[in-house]
Amino acid sequence: MRFDGAAGLAQKMPMLGRVVQAAPLALLLGCCLILTLPASGRTLFYILCSLSLLFLPLAMFQRLEAKPKALNLLLSFALLIFIGFRAAWLWYFPAPTDAGLFPVAFAYQLSNKIWLSALPLLLFPLWSPFRERLSPAGATLALVSASALLSMITLKAWYDAHGVRVGLGSLYATGAAYLLCAIHFSALLLFHPFRLKKWQWLGLCLLIALQFMSIVATGTRAALLVYLFVLGCALLWRFGLYQSWRTYAIAALLSVATLWLSWAAVGSRVKEAQTDLIAYSQGNADTSLGIRFSLWDAGVHAVREQPWGQSIQARDVLFHQLVKDGALNKAALIMRDVHLHNEWLEILSLQGLPGALSWLIFLLGFGVYGWKRGGFFRRFALFYIGFWLVFGLSDVLLLSPQIAMFGAMFAALGLYLAPIFDARDERTL
């Protein structure tokens, strides 16, 4: 007799099925705790990873059709290639001897440990046979509540800081803004097929206003621009361009009111960017944007010199030599013990072209899996890949332990939500 794996356990132990049913809520809670209570979020992350590792061998024995099994193997291999290459790079190149570079080496080691720990968390929803699922309305309500609650927590912190840009928990303001965008976009994504009632439209408008103000509170220019762009695209995709004049009038009034409430913060960040650009054009790179431009220049030089990868220590020596030769602005050395503020340049400057290829395989794995699977996960995969690609242009997300844990739990959340929304019958909340 063939062993049915976790499917047999689901029949004999209904409580286990209920636990799996609650997995999306636990993952959503973990994502929220990473932002608000990082220590609790890390604890929950490792608990979920341990439970997934415990039940993953049972789930692997279930009967699957050929196509789902092939797709599962595709995504599994993409995850393994990304994690395996980073581990091989850490093993091959020696650790830095300069104490000032220890934080960089530790960040890479911790990041790889997090993704390795998260591997069972990502694989279990792929192979899990459990059929008990949350209702689509329940999942939507949970994500909308999380988005609204995080927005209010951010606005409360902003009020207490007297209008100064704020982060959440131990996360810096920029990272907090990126993770808030992920939660906010996922909440709006779940509204796509529903036909809302009039009072629900009002609630959705209030939710969007809260989301926008929470991004403004972080003072992150990239997150603000991306949020407005994605929101505009989502509205056009959902409703089309041709609407009544009342719809445009209400949208214009809401936009003007939101801009008026947030103009002090938005205007200050715009003026700061203009000042930084003027200073950089005059040769002063000791500003927020000036340091970023210098770091990007340093990353380009590193890729040209060592396209196949190098150690952290070797890259630092190269940067000092370039500054000494006058080929690089000395502002690039200010953050030598952090990162290059660009995901691709950070990967290429250390892990070379093979490292960039492994990261591309990771993203393409989600893309191909989502495209072939279709339904909800196709939209989620597009959004998930865009999160890493777009925000990775202005920061290095993989080296932040909170963002790495969030990214792993968020991907697992999408894998759990996919069958919920693919199998739904209802069209109204």
Give the location of each predicted region:
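A membrane-periplasm/extracellular boundary helix in multi-pass inner-membrane enzymes
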Residues: A217, R238-Q282, D297-R304
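Hydrophobic transmembrane alpha-helices and their immediate junctions
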Residues: W245-T247, L350-G386
